[in-house]
Swiss-Prot record:
Residues involved in substrate binding: S146
E.C. no: 1.1.1.-
Listed name of the protein: Tropinone reductase homolog At2g29290
Taxonomy, superkingdom: Eukaryota
Keywords, in A-Z order: NADP, Oxidoreductase
EC category name: oxidoreductase
Family in the record: Belongs to the short-chain dehydrogenases/reductases (SDR) family. SDR65C subfamily.
Lineage: Eukaryota, Viridiplantae, Streptophyta, Embryophyta, Tracheophyta
Residues noted as binding NADP(+) in the record, renumbered to the chain: 13-37
Residue numbers annotated as active site: Y159 (proton acceptor)
Organism: Arabidopsis thaliana (Mouse-ear cress)
A Pfam family matched in the record: adh_short_C2
Amino acid sequence: MDKRWSLQGMNALVTGGTKGIGEAVVEELSILGARVHTCARDETQLQERLREWQEKGFQVTTSICDVSLREQREKLMETVSSLFQGKLNILVNNVGTLMLKPTTEYTAEEFSFLMATNLDSAFHISQLAHPLLKASGSGSIVLMSSIAGVVHVGVGSIYGATKGAMNQLARNLACEWASDNIRTNAICPWLITTPLISDLLSVEEMKKEAEERTPMGRVGEANEVSPLVAFLCLPAASYITGQVICVDGGLTVNGFSYQPHA
């Protein structure tokens, strides 16, 4: 295989890799030859996924981590540094959560929790990973954002704020760390069939309206996001950095079009 299209010999960290987009990303990177470490809060899920990945022949290791907690993030990066001998090629900050409420009803605790889980974790883990990414000689960071950081989609103002901040973080790190040969990009999915939004998609009226407003006429799947993550980490993408890329079936570019019936 052309080395531009292979991750053979590369090390990757994917946060929240036991389900949804994170699980798809772990598998995508593994298929392309990367050695992957992933973390999650649920030990049972970690063990279940690990067995599945081992059966597929993937080089995956796991550890328990709640990325909303600073001390656990520090412990995670110590583990990763030890596993990969102080070098990391790929960091995918994938963990995220949402809480649907009117803005006036959020508590201070809920604000802090969403900020810690979505934004603080991505910022701090990127900070901690910097020396490892630099040591690898060629690093790639992918921030899993959302179109809620680009346009209003009614999934909560705090969630949207965290994702908008992640998009700008990707741009800033791309410029600041370019001299260290570290690239940073953000990916902004729309509705993707994952456990995180299963309750939303179970509301038939909501799902129908979302599909009608999406030019491609459907919600996405996790394995339609993971290939983009993998591509951005490939040597073939070596000149792509600071980009915020929407994976949304065309939603964010859709204005208004009237198609008269024949």
